Design a protein with these regions (language model features):
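Acidic, surface-exposed loops and disordered segments
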Residues: 2-8, 15, 19-195
Length: 195
């Protein structure tokens, strides 16, 4: 009977340890994700170190993991890694920060299908891309391309089909310098149950 009691106590202790470790593991996962979100910053200056094709693919996989209305996945991406193309676009789009970026990812939407919420869907994809870049030690910044003037420049430069509309350009590279995230927490912007 003593042996059975000891075994039962040991089994109980093992179970408690497993549950505790599992909870600790979940807590660690949450901490890692939250740390990545709070560490994300806009990087506008890059070293000459290239971004590998594998890194670009990982960024695009992260972007495509975003939610979309009715699972429509309207996003399309144009990867620009040609130095001359980047330089010519940088001249026309000075706010796109393409002058030192080794690669830029243009986030677009295909408006030929269900596209009522394309800006929401492509924005979610862009945020995933930015968070993935942060997690990978890369720098990136969201630069607008959806207004009429910038959109026309991007459409012409990249020879986009009529149904493809750019949302933003995300220059990506290895940060040149120390960039710090901004603390944007502001409880005064939060309302509960009514304004």
């Amino acid at each position: 009977m003593k042996t059975f009691t000891k075994l039962l106590a040991l089994a109980g202790l093992t179970f408690i340890t497993m549950v505790s470790c599992n909870n600790n593991s979940e807590s660690q996962k949450a901490d890692i994700v939250l740390e990545n979100i709070f560490s994300r910053k806009s990087v506008r200056k890059f070293t000459s170190e290239p971004v590998s094709d594998k890194q670009v693919e990982t960024l695009l996989k992260a972007a495509m993991a975003a939610p979309s209305a009715m699972n429509s996945q309207p996003w399309r991406f144009v990867v620009v890694n040609d130095k001359e193309k980047l330089a010519s676009m940088a001249e026309l789009l000075p706010y796109a920060r393409l002058d030192t970026a080794p690669v830029a990812i243009v986030v677009c939407a295909d408006l030929s299908g269900y596209s009522k919420f394309w800006t929401d869907d492509c924005s979610a994809a862009t945020e995933n891309l930015l968070l993935a870049a942060e997690a990978m030690g890369l720098g990136a910044v969201w630069t607008a391309a959806s207004d009429e003037e910038r959109s026309a420049i991007v459409k012409t430069a990249l020879e986009l089909p009529e149904t493809i509309h750019p949302l933003c350009i995300v220059p990506v590279g290895h940060p040149d310098g120390e960039f710090q995230p901004k603390d944007k927490w502001d409880p005064s912007k939060i309302h509960y149950n009514k304004w």
